[in-house]
């Protein structure tokens, strides 16, 4: 039996939409007949993303937006409403991952400060920018991108994990306050090398926390296969031993949450590779 397409004609606004999860999600939504608003702080990246996604005329627009500035987020929403008259789905995807130990505070503080503004306040800004509109139109869906780092404290992930735990709290609070009006989905991806998040890591050694007791075995595996010559069973999604996801795998699950009847809300999704070594 063919599944019904609930994504078609929905208006989807994505922050951080020019790369990673956001870009993959935008592409998949367009393929299913949605209308997309891509926002990103990088204007050149927006132009590149628009060129790379084949969309019908007037089905997609790109807007520069710094999510740390609530007025810019509100303006992006208003521009979206001018074009499409409604917003069905708000995806708060923009984020950074400045992993570092507390001992790194002198070099990490500025990155941590920005992380709080982007990962926490950016999500809050996205919520309040669409809240009144979704209430007025009678329905809507807010999708917040959290992380498995939000599940439990680990060394090196204190500030990043705290911002993502705060996202979980915002998501659940919004759900409680808007039942029957706004659907809320919280997405907790595992580590996904194909995104730009790793570029923000302050201290590369801080990734040890998420591996915990599996660190030694993981390092042995990498040392046994230098030059990224990792066996196929660890790199293909058709293998139970897959070590790491691609951004598209996460985007597929976000699409799943969007592609539901109006009365069905997928509240919380954890997406991980079946063979990943992360302890969270």
Q: Predicted segments — roles?
A:
Residues 2-36:
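Canonical Rossmann dinucleotide-binding motif of NAD(H)/NADP(H)-dependent dehydrogenases/reductases
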Residues 32-49:
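Conserved glycine-rich Rossmann-like NAD(P)H-binding loop of the short-chain dehydrogenase/reductase
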Residues 127, 163:
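Active-site helix of classical SDR
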Residues 43-44, 64-76, 109:
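The beta1-alpha1 cofactor-binding region of Rossmann-like NAD(H)/NADP(H)-dependent oxidoreductases
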Residues 176-264:
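SDR active-site lid
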Residues 101-116:
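Substrate-binding pocket helix/loop in short-chain dehydrogenase/reductase
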Residues 147:
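Residue(s) in the substrate-gating loop at a strand-loop-helix junction
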